[in-house]
């Protein structure tokens, strides 16, 4: 039996070696190529093929291990429709040759021959999908009413209509889309059926959230909204793209719209590698990956995408590494629970989901990275400027590690830099060594316009079995770390500085099936409030059970002038809500928690972090001591993705009782 296995393995190795030995490269150049060349000629970079159309018609003849190489500096218009798989050790490779910029696969069409319709609106024939409009390289929002902010509605009927008592029929909005902020974290796009009086009736479509009375809406995708430069509307019946230019000449601008839904469409094909390419202007997704195994996207740039840059469904062993993803209207990378064993590493993802109403409906949108597969690694990514969550992940044994996330919850809120909301009861999730800064929040279109709900790390309803360690969170509008109806959470060695509240544990049970906060362990963290309006910690419950939340001890707390409001609690006793405020000393005496925790001074403090992959050395102008009483005289050295709080020696006194 063992001899037979060895022979089979040897035979497989020989076959794979032979496949690789006979693998060939096919060359493409949009500037020098000719599609009339033979396949033998196309193996020579001096006689390349020209177009993506030629690639798609020839694809069935490509063999495992073959390479498709595009000339650097060239632009290829259209899309790639994959119709062949590679092999486990011999993937089909898409790459580049020559010198210069990355070759670009471009899904845009240029609009020309503009005709004045009236009132500053011009039209151009548009035979394409027209999901996006790009003006001089900048994505434009659909025309909308009002031009900014939200109108509000007083009532609704199910998920079918809203009524705004101030809206009248001076302008009839009987077509287009109504964009409704149904909750703080949901912006839905619904097709309008009719407008009568103050009532707009719409199709629910695939949206399931019901509107909240008093929240906001606006109208878009209707020609009557066009009154600001760059606003647009596509009349798909008459194939007409209408754009408001005002008194400007449209011929002085480069105007593009999406000509393809997907730039790379992979459905049930495996073992493909895309390396060193640029993908621009997909109407929907630059990469649409369905039931396909071992797809690798490496060192690529993905720009100006109509929904997500990369969306994958039931596609295990997906790798996205060393890529730059910029200006995606709905999401950066989106992977469902079938995308197990994924690796998302060392990518830069920026400007995601920043135009309200231009992303997709429902949850899991306006996010940089969304992942629900088991054994996923999300590591060393840089996320900058995202409409909602920086990273939303779940899945058994999945990890978010050493990511740098800054400026999030810019379009929606009640979200976080790193968010886990796990109704699937997965276990062994880890949040390690991340740096999360600038949780902004956006409460426009809600009843709470003075409250910004942006958390640094947010562990939401029914989540369990999470380790949160060695993270740095600062400058978040609401909470640094928030635990909401979750259990079995370990919070160790984190530095939480200058957030609205540094540690928040909230149990409310608005949803009857939510977990109770139990068996949590909070130790060796630094919770540093910088202003009088901030708290170091806040605990709340709909019962009288804060003592059952878990073990909280050996932490470092700091608040200005040892404020009485440094720590707050809220619980229900004998049917009445009891709100309390504490100094650390009083909190210890009343809660039985934080027995070995200490207070830090707030004056003459130095906070530094290192959000890079290299060791960082910081020169010190005076002598400092860290919270563990280690002294630093001339410099402090920080490892990658670490931070430190230093206290000038003259002010350091650690109070533990």
Question: Where do the language-model regions lie?
Answer:
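Boundary at the C-terminal end of the N-terminal hydrophobic targeting segment
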Residues: 21-23
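Bacterial N-terminal signal peptides
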Residues: 8-17
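Extracellular beta-strand/beta-solenoid scaffold signature
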Residues: 119-123, 257-263, 283-285, 306-311, ...
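Extracellular polysaccharide-degrading/modifying enzymes targeting complex plant/algal/animal polysaccharides
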Residues: 25-291, 296, 303, 577-584, ...
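C-terminal beta-sandwich/jelly-roll accessory domains of carbohydrate-active enzymes
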Residues: 603-657
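Right-handed parallel beta-helix
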Residues: 270-281, 293-306, 316-330, 339-358, ...
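Predominantly extracellular beta-rich ligand-binding scaffolds that present long acidic/polar faces
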Residues: 77-93, 100, 465-601
